[in-house]
Amino acid sequence: MGAASISQAVYAAEEPAKPAAAAPAVVKPDPAKGDTLFNTAPPNGVSCASCHNADGNSAVAVNPKLAQQHPEYILKQLQEFKAGKRKSAIMQPMVQHLSTQDMRDISWFLGSKPVKNGFSKEKDLVALGERIYRGGIPDRMIPACAGCHSPNGAGIPAQYPRLGGQHADYTDAQLKSFRDGVRANSAQMTGVARKMNDREIKAVSDYIAGLR
């Protein structure tokens, strides 16, 4: 090997490795942009607010209240609608035009809005609903809802959704969807709901509506 070749080999060995490419920076959520996205209809479409109201407090019992929900939970649901992991003939087309940043902006906008209080309506079931929510049904291995969603329904940020004040009709429908395998994006909730009958689901859903 010639001197020039040796010199080149030594230089190559000593040349510092190039730094790895930096990961793309995560852009901070912009609730103001989220407000615009939520309340503005896309071309040939309808706005999110048309079903959930301008501040996320849906007045229609089958449409969920989104106000004050943990942003991380909303973001996860939007992403799973788009990916098809959570099925909905209404929501899947609604989110297809949204980027991840759009979803983040919308999620943090909704998380910043106060939820309006709800009310329990089923007087004959409220005691059963409270018993299930706070203590579960131990002999059937049904855990207390409060263990994950907190005694007042506030949930745990970035882990478990807020439930307090949610429309009973919506909660009832979601629990049945988990139970019947229609909604399959939470193995934990599917396992719980499969052990509950219609009366128990109705009772706990009504109790949740009155939490605050």
Where are these regions (language model features)?
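The canonical Cys-X-X-Cys-His
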Residues: G45-A54, I106, I142-P151, V204
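N-terminal export/targeting leaders of redox proteins
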Residues: M1-K28, Q79, R199, A209-R212
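Stable alpha-helical elements in mature extracytoplasmic
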Residues: D30-K33, S47, H70, Q77, ...
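Axial heme c-ligation environment in periplasmic c-type cytochrome domains
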Residues: A59-K65, F81-K121, P157-R162, D180-R212
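The feature marks the first
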Residues: P24-A83
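Sequence context surrounding c-type heme c attachment/ligation sites in exported
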Residues: D35-A49, L75, R134-A146, A158-A173
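Electrostatic cytochrome c docking/interface patches
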Residues: A13-P42, V60, S112-P138
